[in-house]
Curated annotation (Swiss-Prot):
Keywords: Metal-binding, Transferase, Ubl conjugation pathway, Zinc, Zinc-finger. The gene is RHF2A. Residues 211-245, 327-336 have a biased composition (Polar residues). It is an enzyme of class 2 (transferase). Residues 146-165, 172-262, 318-375 are annotated as: Disordered. InterPro entries: Znf_RING (IPR001841), Znf_RING/FYVE/PHD (IPR013083). This is E3 ubiquitin-protein ligase RHF2A. Residues 146-159 have a biased composition (Basic residues). It comes from Arabidopsis thaliana (Mouse-ear cress).
C-alpha cells in the first residue's frame, strides 16, 4: 500500500509538472519545488514569493529568464527576501536586454579580469553606475552557478545542452584572452596576499566601445557559468580607447606598487639566472682547461711508457736472436771436437811409433858402433 501511495504521489508530481510546463495553473507542492519537483533541504532551502509560493532560488531565477510571472498563479513575481529580490531584478534586466537588443556597448577594463563588454548602458553613465551593474552581473552569475552545481543536482537529473540559455551579458573584448580561473591559487606569503587583494579590489572605471565577444567566467563563483554571445552583436565594430585620466582613476598608487614589486621580482630572478649562467660557464671553462693540461701530461707519460716498452721489447728480441745464434755455433764446435779426437789418437799412435823407430835406430847404430870398434 505504501508503494502504491508513493507511486501515485510521484505520478501526481509528474502530471503537475507536465501541466505546469504546458501552462496550466496547478496546486503548489507541499515540501518540494513545483518547478523541479525536488524536495527542499538545508543546503538548498525554499524561496517564498509574494504570492506565497515556494521554489528553489535557482529554479525561480531560471524561470524568470523566460517569464516574469509566477508559474503557479501567473502573477507578477517578487521575492520576500531582499537579497533574492536583488538577484531576481538583475536576472529580469538581463532578460529585458536580450529581448530588446541595442547597438550600444561599453568596454569595461579591469586590471585583473581583463576587458568586459557591457551592453545596453546609457551614454552618459558614470563610474558608480557601471560598478553597480557589474556587481549585479557577477552576483547573479555566482548565485546561478552555486545553485546549479549544488548537492541537490548531483545524480538526480541531467539537462540536454539544447535547453541551455544565456545567463548574463558580460563579454570579453579580447577573443584570445584567457578567462580567470574559478579557483585562483592562494598566495604563500602575506605580502602576496595583500597584493592580490589590492588588485582584485580596484575600482572599475575605464570605458570604451567595441563588440568582440567571447566566453568569460565570474571570479566570485565557485562554479562559473559559460556565456554564449548573442547573434545580434556578432559584427565587429571599432574599439575606442578610453582617456588616460579615466584609466588613472583605477588606483594608480596600487597599480604602481604592484608593477614595482613585479619589476623588482623580475630583476631579482634575472640577476639570479645571470649569476648561475656565468658560474656554469666558468666551471665549464675550468673543466675544459684542466682536461687539456691533464691530457698533455697524460700524453707525455704515455709516450715515456711506450718508449720504455719498445726498448724492453727490442732487448728481448736481441736476447732471443743471440740465443738462437749461439745454439748452432755450439753444435758445430761439438761436432768439430768429435771429429778431431780420432785424428789426435792417430797422431799419438804415430808419435809412439816414431819414438820406437828412433829407439830401434839408436840400438842399430850402437850395435854398429860396437861392431866397428871391436874390429
Amino acid at each position: 500500500m505504501e508503494g502504491a501511495g508513493e507511486t501515485t504521489t510521484s505520478e501526481g508530481h509528474l502530471t503537475s509538472a507536465a501541466a505546469f510546463v504546458e501552462g496550466g495553473i496547478q496546486d503548489a507542492c507541499d515540501d518540494a519545488c513545483s518547478i523541479c519537483l525536488e524536495s527542499f533541504c538545508e543546503s538548498d532551502p525554499s524561496t517564498l514569493t509574494s504570492c506565497k509560493h515556494e521554489y528553489h532560488l535557482q529554479c525561480i531565477l531560471e524561470w524568470c529568464q523566460r517569464s516574469s510571472q509566477c508559474p503557479m498563479c501567473w502573477q507578477s513575481i517578487s521575492l520576500k527576501d531582499p537579497t533574492s529580490q536583488e538577484l531576481l531584478e538583475a536576472v529580469e534586466q538581463e532578460r529585458n536586454f536580450r529581448f530588446n537588443p541595442t547597438r550600444n556597448a561599453t568596454i569595461f577594463r579591469h586590471p585583473t579580469l581583463g576587458d568586459f563588454e557591457l551592453q545596453h548602458l546609457p551614454v552618459g553613465v558614470d563610474n558608480a553606475e557601471i560598478e553597480e551593474r557589474i556587481i549585479q552581473h557577477l552576483a547573479a552569475a555566482a548565485a546561478m552557478g552555486r545553485a546549479r552545481h549544488g548537492v541537490r543536482r548531483e545524480g538526480h537529473r541531467s539537462r540536454s545542452s539544447s535547453q541551455g540559455h544565456q545567463q548574463f551579458m558580460v563579454f570579453s573584448s579580447q577573443p584570445n584572452a584567457s578567462s580567470p580561473p574559478p579557483h585562483p591559487p592562494m598566495p604563500s606569503s602575506p605580502s602576496q596576499r595583500d597584493e592580490s587583494d589590492t588588485v582584485s579590489n580596484l575600482p572599475h572605471n575605464a570605458l570604451g566601445e567595441g563588440s568582440h565577444q567571447s566566453n568569460t567566467q565570474p571570479p566570485t563563483s565557485s562554479h562559473p557559468r559559460q556565456v554564449s554571445p548573442s547573434a545580434s552583436d556578432s559584427n565587429s565594430r571599432p574599439l575606442n580607447q578610453s582617456s588616460p585620466s579615466e584609466q588613472d582613476r583605477a588606483g594608480p598608487s596600487e597599480l604602481q606598487s604592484f608593477s614595482e614589486s613585479l619589476k623588482s621580482r623580475l630583476n631579482a630572478v634575472s640577476t639570479r639566472y645571470k649569476e648561475s649562467i656565468s658560474k656554469n660557464t666558468r666551471n665549464w671553462k675550468d673543466r675544459l682547461f684542466s682536461r687539456n693540461t691533464s691530457m698533455a701530461d697524460l700524453g707525455s707519460e704515455v709516450k715515456r711508457e711506450v718508449s720504455a716498452g719498445i726498448a724492453t721489447v727490442s732487448r728481448m728480441m736481441e736476447r732471443l736472436e743471440t740465443r738462437e745464434n749461439s745454439r748452432p755455433s755450439t753444435a758445430s764446435v761439438s761436432d768439430v771436437s768429435e771429429n778431431h779426437t780420432p785424428e789426435t789418437n792417430n797422431e799419438h799412435n804415430r808419435a809412439a811409433a816414431g819414438d820406437e823407430h828412433s829407439v830401434n835406430e839408436r840400438g842399430v847404430k850402437e850395435t854398429c858402433a860396437t861392431g866397428s870398434g871391436s874390429s
